[in-house]
UniProtKB/Swiss-Prot annotation:
One of its GO terms (molecular function) is pyridoxal phosphate binding. The gene is gcvPB. Belongs to the GcvP family. C-terminal subunit subfamily. The glycine cleavage system is composed of four proteins: P, T, L and H. In this organism, the P 'protein' is a heterodimer of two subunits. One of its GO terms (cellular component) is cytosol. This is Probable glycine dehydrogenase (decarboxylating) subunit 2. The glycine cleavage system catalyzes the degradation of glycine. The P protein binds the alpha-amino group of glycine through its pyridoxal phosphate cofactor; CO(2) is released and the remaining methylamine moiety is then transferred to the lipoamide cofactor of the H protein. The modification N6-(pyridoxal phosphate)lysine is found at K264. GO terms for biological process: glycine decarboxylation via glycine cleavage system.
């Protein structure tokens, strides 16, 4: 039920209505509302009940096991949120003077240094407001670097066929042509194809390591040498940093620039389209091109660096300092765990993934790459289940919802047929993993004996299978368009 269906003329929550509304605003008259907004007329109790019930119908990290591959749905520690909400942080105005913001600036400066140490890259900018924007910033810096050298013939970005969809999107937005590199049968990049396609037009290559196949790219040093010898740069998509945190640094692997997804590796909140934060880290040669602002330290304290400090900067990507509240959460998460704790993150993440992969193969599931160990995530292929029992990966995913488990990522990467990409983050216990295995075993038995149960799933949720194509092509967000 939509909240408009609860509406009744004259009903209102008076406690929430301001006694007087000031009209001393500077909105031009042509932009001022001429009629009252068409809001639902509901009591406060109705509103509270409605949205509380909606929240109870959602799947979330706080309520359900959430093995969504390539998303690192780890628990967000409440103490971190509390620390980031200290009055000195949340009451600071974005335009406050540097000398009135020394504590805030010092915190961000330390965060820059922590990220530099974690990534093995000397330059860090915190300003991008999402992983995708950080990715765009990284590719834009690659372009600025080549242009500053007069190397304008480099108009190609190499991208593996198993890459995240944002990779080619960022490359195209920066004016590059995307050149796809195939994956070899063992899950690594096809080096022979890379050798054929890298050349004088190569601006760079975008990689995730471990890849979205859940496999560590074993020839990364050779790849780095090939691209660098051709004059290109290496971009690291930080989506899977959780798998190698504290073990190996992207800078040490030969990468020149990367973005970090704070909502994945560093436990800031997911969802809702934001707020997000996607800091970028760069090697020495790209420091001049970093997006502003960044925090610098001088004898007089901490200050915002300006265009005078970075005249070749690609510019600003956001107002002020990006999403400061999210950056603070990542900083306190690092403080809470410390160096040893961050190392344990990757150890437990990879342990969980390999344990779960082993247990699921014991109950009949097929690993997409049975000869390889998982990193922090892995892929099951349900191709045989589809051929033998006419049930799909989507059927398995929908049935999991009936058992109170959020579905893994389905049909991604596209090169693995009928796949589930499963990522059990380090915050999940062995008991939770064992419970998931038991559910998966039950669902597979249902697929064999009663496949129609899977085909009609979910059975217990208020919403069944939606028409995704219709929703995408016939966007309807106006209640009154169909109810008048």
């Amino acid at each position: 039920m939509l909240i408009f269906e609860l509406s009744k003329t004259g009903r209102q929550a008076k406690a929430q209505i301001p006694r007087a509304v000031s009209k001393n605003y500077s909105i031009p008259e042509e932009f001022q509302r001429k009629s009252p907004p068409r809001l639902p007329a509901c009591s406060e109790l109705q509103v509270v009940r409605h949205f509380t019930c909606l929240s109870q119908k959602n799947f979330s990290i706080d309520t359900n096991f959430y093995p969504l591959g390539s998303c690192t749905m780890k628990y967000n520690p409440r103490g971190v949120h509390k620390a980031a909400s200290l009055p000195g942080f949340i009451n600071r105005h974005p335009l406050a003077m540097d000398n009135e913001s020394q504590g805030f600036l010092e915190t961000l400066y330390k965060l820059q240094n922590y990220i530099s140490e974690i990534t093995g890259m000397p330059g860090v900018s915190l300003t991008p407001m999402a992983g995708s924007q950080g990715e765009f910033a990284g590719v834009a810096m690659i372009k600025a670097y080549h242009q500053s050298r007069g190397d304008t013939a480099r108009d190609e970005i190499l991208i593996p066929d198993a890459a995240h969809g944002t990779n080619p999107a960022s490359a195209v937005m920066c004016g590059f042509k995307v050149v796809e590199i195939a994956t070899a049968p063992d899950g690594d990049i096809d080096l022979d194809e890379l050798k054929r396609k890298v050349g004088p037009r190569t601006a760079g290559i975008m990689l995730t390591n471990p890849s979205t196949l859940g496999l560590f790219m074993r020839q990364i040093k050779e790849i780095a040498n090939l691209v660098h010898q051709a004059g290109g740069l290496l971009y690291y998509d930080g989506a899977n940093l959780n798998a190698i945190l504290g073990k190996v640094r992207p800078g040490d692997m030969g990468f020149d620039v990367m973005h970090l997804n704070l909502h994945k590796t560093f436990a800031t909140p997911h969802g809702g389209g934001g707020p997000g934060a996607g800091p970028v880290a760069v090697g020495k040669r790209l420091i001049p091109y970093m997006p502003l602002p960044v925090v610098k330290k001088t004898d007089s304290g901490y200050h915002w660096a300006t265009r005078q400090d970075y005249p070749q900067s690609i510019g600003r990507l956001s107002c002020f300092m990006g999403n400061a509240g999210i950056l603070l959460r990542a900083y306190f998460y690092m403080l809470v765990l410390g160096k040893e704790g961050l190392l344990r993150v990757s150890e437990f993440a990879t342990l969980n993934a390999n344990y779960l992969l082993k247990e699921l193969t014991k109950v009949g599931y097929t690993a997409a790459y049975p000869g390889r160990r998982a990193s922090h995530e892995f892929i099951l292929t349900l191709n045989s289940e589809k051929k033998n029992y006419d049930v799909t990966a989507m059927d398995f995913a929908k049935r999991l919802l009936d058992y109170g488990v959020h579905a893994p990522t389905t049909y991604f990467p596209l090169l693995v047929p009928e796949c589930l990409l499963i990522e059990p983050p380090e915050t999940e216990s062995k008991e939770e993993l064992d419970a998931f295995v038991a559910v998966m075993k039950t669902i597979r038995e249902e697929a064999i004996k009663q496949p129609d149960i899977l085909k009609a799933a979910p059975h217990t949720l208020p919403v069944k299978r939606l028409d995704d194509v219709k929703a995408a092509r016939e966007l309807d967000l106006n209640y009154f368009a169909t109810h008048e």
